[in-house]
């Protein structure tokens, strides 16, 4: 189990270094078995420009650990990023496979106007 986590963190580190070289704003996703979190982080990496998660009051009432919840988080993060004036982001999946909830969040964000 520990090796699996270490490998994921290694993949995440490599991705973040590449995104930092590009100097783009990034959409960072983190998932746990119960919740999913999304943040739009500045190019310098020192400021969170927008965030959304299943921990928020309006999403907490429904199921929080499934693809439907991830889709709702994707829609909300795209809307909040647009309000902050952000149209284009680099997708940081934090070493997680692009599948299931991570994919659902990314697809919903794309459909609601964010460019990756």
Swiss-Prot record:
A Pfam short name: Ribosomal_L18p
Gene3D superfamilies: 3.30.420.100
Single GO BP term: translation
GO CC annotation terms, alphabetical: cytosolic large ribosomal subunit
Annotated keywords: Ribonucleoprotein, Ribosomal protein, RNA-binding, rRNA-binding
Keyword Ribosomal protein listed: yes
GO molecular function: 5S rRNA binding; structural constituent of ribosome
CDD domains: Ribosomal_L18_L5e
Subunit-level organization: Part of the 50S ribosomal subunit; part of the 5S rRNA/L5/L18/L25 subcomplex. Contacts the 5S and 23S rRNAs.
Family in the record: Belongs to the universal ribosomal protein uL18 family.
Function, as annotated: This is one of the proteins that bind and probably mediate the attachment of the 5S RNA into the large ribosomal subunit, where it forms part of the central protuberance.
Protein name, per record: Large ribosomal subunit protein uL18
Gene of this entry: rplR
